[in-house]
Amino acid sequence: MAMLAQTPPMGFNTWNTFGPNINEQMMLEITDVMVERGYRDAGYKYVVIDDCWSMRERNENGELVADPEKFPHGMKFIADYVHSKGLKFGMYSCAGIRTCAGFPSSFDHEYQDARTFASWGVDFLKYDWCFDEAQSPQGAYR
């Protein structure tokens, strides 16, 4: 039998504070602050990288790739670090043809991207709805 969560997902998302100006060192520092200042113990469990984390185009295999200038060790490195601190790692994607900031999104790549996120150790996905006027959320879900 499924149980309801005791709280909504609580944590830190980069967008409202940093927008597109995100990088690996920042994510490690945010993770440390969540632990050192007691947020983790108060129930805040998620560290979420929002939009603008990827390259502007997918690689030759059609996969999303973290921007190596911003994230030189890649997303699995960050996920492993977040997990080592007893927190959960979240990432951003979008249902449209592009993310809200114009980066590659998961439209028509949902399965491939889900496998990629899983291989990186992603626990949570923030899924936006930009650049998808052709279909309704209900239609896309079906």
What are these regions (language model features)?
Residues 3, 25, 135-138:
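Residue-level detector of secondary-structure boundary/capping sites
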Residues 8, 23, 27-30:
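Short N-terminal amphipathic alpha-helix/helix-capping patch enriched in small hydrophobics
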Residues 1-19:
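An acidic-aromatic substrate-binding cleft motif
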Residues 29-134, 140:
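Aromatic-lined carbohydrate-binding/catalytic grooves of carbohydrate-active enzymes
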Residues 4-5, 26-27, 73:
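Metal-dependent phosphate/diphosphate-handling catalytic cores characterized by acidic Asp/Glu clusters
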Residues 22-24, 100-101:
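Short linear motifs at secondary-structure transitions and domain/linker junctions
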Residues 15-22, 66-68:
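Second-shell loop/turn segments in exported
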